[in-house]
């Protein structure tokens, strides 16, 4: 196996797991770099690429296929890395972008709510009640 993609819920330490896995295996670890590469190569602001993944297409985008074009830019940047093999990807939509590639191990990390609350408290310096409220509202 030469490609691992890791998806995660918020505050489940997916980045940490991905980086340690890549280090242990001697693989390249990639994430947001893909968006930056696509943004630079196709001269598209990074925020537009992020919105293409998160938001519903606008009326204009439905007619111009803007969303599909942006998604294909991101996929191209990711596939350029995957072709080299020995990659751990932990960025946006990895399971989607690598859907029909047979030599990909797809991992989903889910942390229990108690661990997520602790991590939110640690990172954001919040009370446990406020952290729990924020996590439940996502």
Specify the residue positions occupied by each region the protein language model found.
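Conserved beta-strand scaffold positions in the cores of enzyme catalytic domains, especially
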Residues: 3, 29, 104-106
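Post-Walker A helix-loop "phosphate-sensing" segment adjacent to the P-loop in P-loop NTPases
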Residues: 24-30
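Glycine-rich phosphate-binding P-loop
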Residues: 5-21
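Residue-level signature of catalytic and energy-coupling elements of molecular machines
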Residues: 18, 88, 116
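Fold-independent oxyanion-binding glycine-rich loops
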Residues: 8-9, 91-92, 138
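Residue-level preference for the first positions of well-ordered beta-strands
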Residues: 3-5, 86-88
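ATP-dependent small-molecule kinase phosphotransfer cores
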Residues: 33-86, 93, 126
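Conserved phosphate-donor/acceptor-positioning beta-strand/loop module used by diverse small-molecule
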Residues: 100-123, 128-137
